[in-house]
């Protein structure tokens, strides 16, 4: 939110204050300030000028040759504005001066000398209007500095909206001014409000059909409005605070919202004669002020004229009842709606506005009348002929209870840890608008309405109010005397960190960070469908409307988008997936590891065995055991129908290794290959971790024996290994896969057997005996020696 210091000065005397230091105090005490902008700093030596003569440029249809009276002299100027004319008063930037675009100097333009520039509002940085030069009041004296006429100089600071979530009173300048008053110890001036008394017998009838979500609805009709352009001061303030000036009535509703934080809405009075606030009985199409037709469902609060919807309550008005430049009578709405209802409607409709952002914070219902009185005051100040044309209608359906908190001085001392005098406590709370009564060291504090909606509710909140204004930087810093205890991380998080170390340090993989929702357009490029996944309600972008049930599609998209940057690489991520819903209806959220190995030079088979090696390494390093693999049918359509294997720990499935389905693989890359790993981190973390058994290395020479075996179709590695494991050969140190080979449907592998003894060097005859027995056992399952 953008805040104008000039606006704040309307309510707090800041003379003598260091504004930058004051803003810093505001950051420490109230809300974070993200940036400070010095408006008007770039505008220098811009004065009132009067066009004395005008000639068309002899060689240009757009340029004009002017003489301009700037008070102490008459200067020449070449100007291309379409609205320039003789006798016109303009904002003239003299040579040596500055505008937003830069310094102005004497120059020759199209062959003629120009000693300055006639400025548009955009060039002065006070609006986006750039269709012509700025026209000034004819009564302004030539040569008068433009800054003496308009509040161009200002300091605007930007407050982080997240800091204001629990402070609905700070969504307007008056609430910020109250904070500044408390920080400086100065008086907060009251708002200048109008009296709403009227001789008119007219009434704008209001019917509240939904009293649960409509807390208060106030409205009033005004007529005989003849002025339609806002004063420059109001337009500049709106522009500096991020609003686009439109017309007087629209500008004033925005002005009041920025001033006190209360949204208002002005309806064309010729189109409104009986207001009803309720939810529709069935879904309807409604066109809002931005020209977009939206579907309002039966949970959306609407404003009706009789039975015709004219606005979405708390969010935006309708196109058919909007005020235009020449509107002369309005019905002003100032209401208070349930913030949760407004937020949900805003989310469903995909429409978030400045008004809805404020209603979401649970505004003070007492502001509705303040806003109407302020609107009437401003309209009458600008247009003296405007009149109140109805009685005030004020339907107050639901009031917040008054909150009174009682505590003693000892409570303050205990929770602050310092001595703050009774006088300072009373003074601080009074400046913030709290009612305070103190008797015998016991304080009775009445919370003001603008802090009672969801902000200050318990005694500890009062302590916060006292200490933040006192200044946290005024507390004496002391070293903690409590014992320091180590932080215990969740086992699955520690396991995740260990896996990351293995993948990065041993296999040089790259970690990816992605969103849990699916980008359906990107998935579709790879032929991956996610329509059966858990869906997100009220999503603004329909392409991101489902949650992933596997880490791998996200990683495959990343591989697809980066396939041209490297020939071979591995990427991984540990993230959340949603595996359907539980019996209680909640999402079944799990933490999974996903790995994609991609290569344009290695075959799918080589990548598959590398994936097996990666899984083996993870198990050996963390669980100190080897995993088991079992062929399974694919769970996802993008998995290879044959080359998919479950990863087992203690007989329980904790993940899988798979190649891609040929159709998906061709869409990923026609010449490259990809193999995937996915593991449930939670299940893997819960699996048994075996003790590390130290086996002293043998001092004797090891004996290696390579066997090239021809496998029958369907034989698994587990079936092979069971044959030599059952022999319990103590001297068999390890068995490793060295190579694989396939030709004409026949598959062969090469295994390296390593034998070693601690007390002797093995004889070749002894080793050969074991090998012969292994071959004999393998022959029983259809495995033969390749010759």
Tell me the role of every PLM-derived stretch.
Residues 3-8, 154-163, 215-223, 354-362, ...:
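Short, hydrophobic beta-strand segments
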Residues 5, 24, 64, 188-284, ...:
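Glycine/proline-enriched, intrinsically flexible loops and inter-domain linkers
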Residues 40-44, 197-198, 446, 484-489, ...:
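Beta-rich nucleic-acid/ligand-interaction surfaces
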Residues 48-78, 253-320:
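Conserved mixed alpha/beta core segments that line enzyme active sites in large multi-domain catalysts
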Residues 113-123, 130-134, 151-155, 300-400, ...:
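Mobile "lid/hinge" segments at catalytic clefts and subdomain interfaces of large enzymes
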Residues 405-409, 413-569, 754-756, 766-787:
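Extended, well-folded interaction surfaces typified by the phenylalanyl-tRNA synthetase beta subunit core
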Residues 431-434, 444, 588, 601-787:
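A carboxyl-terminal module marker
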